[in-house]
């Protein structure tokens, strides 16, 4: 189960406590010890850390999977650091190839603009957008010349790019990989250079891209950013990464009843990761609930109810969560009543004239 490492010796107690919060649930924080060093250096300099998260507006709705990294960014905000949200209105025209088995359809500028507008509205359910620095990466990527791109491409080799699991699999399978997909990590990396990121947050599928950003910063004379990756949340199928294209998503702007119902239907085996990645429960309580859920049956059902209440409360408030739970329970009783009524119905006599050739004619 995810958890936080012990703070390094010599770190002031308040920074040690902050480090525990910021690393809790993370899949990796690299280089090792770098976040503690950055926290201490920022304290000495009297400035907040610049913590970057990039989002490409690839669809109209954000899921609980998107919220995993958004909530980590909010933790940095709550500790006094500056959240820098990069809206990929330039990279969104290309599409992130991470985790893809084939080339994405390129979006139009109008599609990207509309998706970006709805994204910002939904991001406000998690981040304090007014306190964040919101940037659009066309600001620095659109003016680049072909010569600029050539100089940038010199920092990465094709061999480096083929180390990526998704590219390697596609290459081995003979699936086409466009050159623009190879350039995508460089574009994302330039975002880090442009805003001088101290830390970048992303899912584990972004690990390669985040390290490219770190390398490009150093090539431009900047300190390389700390890379903090979060686990990918599996969807309602309990197998694949949560994604609209796989129809396994739970969306931030869904009605409370829909969120509650979907959470009650997730497979038992993903309950633990949902508790860790979608709630703000204390880690000790999460471990206790995960252990309870491992027993299955009624125990797992009770944990799901707690999970659903917590998540709906986060995005809609406690009253909406109580109403959603009541509506769910009423639906369960209604379905149970329908089954009982059918079982207790009197037998129906079928006349012999309605039976012929092994069939009943109605």
Task: Explain the meaning of each model-derived region.
Residues 2-50:
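Positively charged, low-complexity intrinsically disordered leader regions
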Residues 26, 105-229, 238:
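Divalent-metal (Mg2+/Mn2+/Ca2+)-assisted nucleotide/phosphate chemistry catalytic cores
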Residues 32-97, 199-207, 213:
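N-terminal catalytic cores of NTP/NDP-binding nucleotidyl/phosphoryl-transfer enzymes
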Residues 46-55, 83, 184-194, 235, ...:
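Short, hydrophobic/aliphatic alpha-helical segments
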Residues 59-60, 92-94, 142-144, 234-237:
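Flexible loop/turn segments at secondary-structure boundaries
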Residues 74-127:
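Well-ordered mid-protein domain cores that form the structural environment of catalytic cofactors
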Residues 88-92, 189-192, 280:
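Short connector loops/turns at beta-strand edges and beta->alpha or beta->beta junctions
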Residues 216-362:
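Conserved nucleotide- and phosphate/pyrophosphate-binding catalytic cores
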